[in-house]
From Swiss-Prot:
Annotated positions of the N-acetylthreonine modification: 15
Main subcellular location: plastid
Topology versus the membrane: Multi-pass membrane protein
UniProt keyword annotations, A-Z: Acetylation, Chlorophyll, Chloroplast, Chromophore, Manganese, Membrane, Metal-binding, Phosphoprotein, Photosynthesis, Photosystem II, Plastid, Thylakoid, Transmembrane, Transmembrane helix
GO molecular function, one term: chlorophyll binding
Positions of post-translational Phosphothreonine modification: 15
The encoding gene: psbC
Protein name: Photosystem II CP43 reaction center protein
Proregion span(s): 1-14
UniProt keyword Hydrolase present: no
Subcellular location: Plastid, Chloroplast thylakoid membrane
Organism whose genome encodes this protein: Solanum bulbocastanum
Amino acid sequence: MKTLYSRRRFYHVETLFNGTLALAGRDQETTGFAWWAGNARLINLSGKLLGAHVAHAGLIVFWAGAMNLFEVAHFVPEKPMYEQGLILLPHLATLGWGVGPGGEVIDTFPYFVSGVLHLISSAVLGFGGIYHALLGPETLEESFPFFGYVWKDRNKMTTILGIHLILLGIGAFLLVFKALYFGGVYDTWAPGGGDVRKITNLTLSPSIIFGYLLKSPFGGEGWIVSVDDLEDIIGGHVWLGSICILGGIWHILTKPFAWARRALVWSGEAYLSYSLGALAVFGFIACCFVWFNNTAYPSEFYGPTGPEASQAQAFTFLVRDQRLGANVGSAQGPTGLGKYLMRSPTGEVIFGGETMRFWDLRAPWLEPLRGPNGLDLSRLKKDIQPWQERRSAEYMTHAPLGSLNSVGGVATEINAVNYVSPRSWLATSHFVLGFFFFVGHLWHAGRARAAAAGFEKGIDRDFEPVLSMTPLN
């Protein structure tokens, strides 16, 4: 295969390497990268790079299957999922598998099947990864030109992009088909405290779906994270899946326009940086979604959101004190504002106390008590159902706050319960990983742009002092 660029110009940072550790000819002399630079050694070996990626997919799927079975083995049906440190079973339950009314787990067998299927898949991927890493052809261009590529071949790169987009679109439609035809998904808003249901009346109106993108990210607006009904979520997946598939077909059939050829850097490291940037955005959005959204991430499985736990505490004490004879409509708190209820600046009736900052919370156990002007006093006096009391008392004591005292007014006690909410884990991990991916995006973008501009970054390796020193061994 003809190399389209000089190695010196493209591999602009050379790394020190102990030659005795050369692996199958992929040493620093032949690649410009040391063993610890990992897959960078395989930039021009498409067959070996395929092996690395397939093996990596095998590791990911193996973790999913093994962790899935671990959670099934430790699962106690009598306790809520969020009390058991589970992060995978809540996702399966949200998809409607194994759960019934109120999010109660009625069958763990689907979870077991999911774990086993992932383990079997990981074995296939693992075998493929080892085969392509050790036995398969080093490069695919000669024997399998369809799967071969040169990083600078812009047309081939957009074709690969198109194939990826089509696969993502199919993934989005898998959720749509599950919700429409294959048993439905769990809806936390179903009457009486949540249930699995098929989604029949999809929201396909572009003004509603794309209206989410135009909303402010702040306060009661909340951008796309504010979505609170499954019709909109599944309808959004129809739109996303369609856009991905049509965009994929477009990128397969067309060549990049002149402005794109000029504006973008066309090298392996540049594509890596673009991908890391996209994943960073996904991570930050996922962080906000799992922290604030209790429709896509139902509180029955993931535990309450922070605002939800705070509002649940206000509601629980309102119920208690109302039973003890308090007039919750007029009682004053220590600041002179309403102790149980007050008005927001725009006039809605909201819970009083520190939880006032979370006045815009929407939760299935609370919404039935609202009227046209916020919380309805007559409903609070006459219509509170036992399931609402039970759920709010449960959520009050399971805030996703660790043991910080008085966050949003939630009374926490470090000795009370050994509990970390899955929302805390998932939100924190996705924020931290999203940040790392963003730094990786900046790093690889800088290297790729430097290489494209034809200059090297870093110290001059030819006259580096360490080269004149005795080897360690």
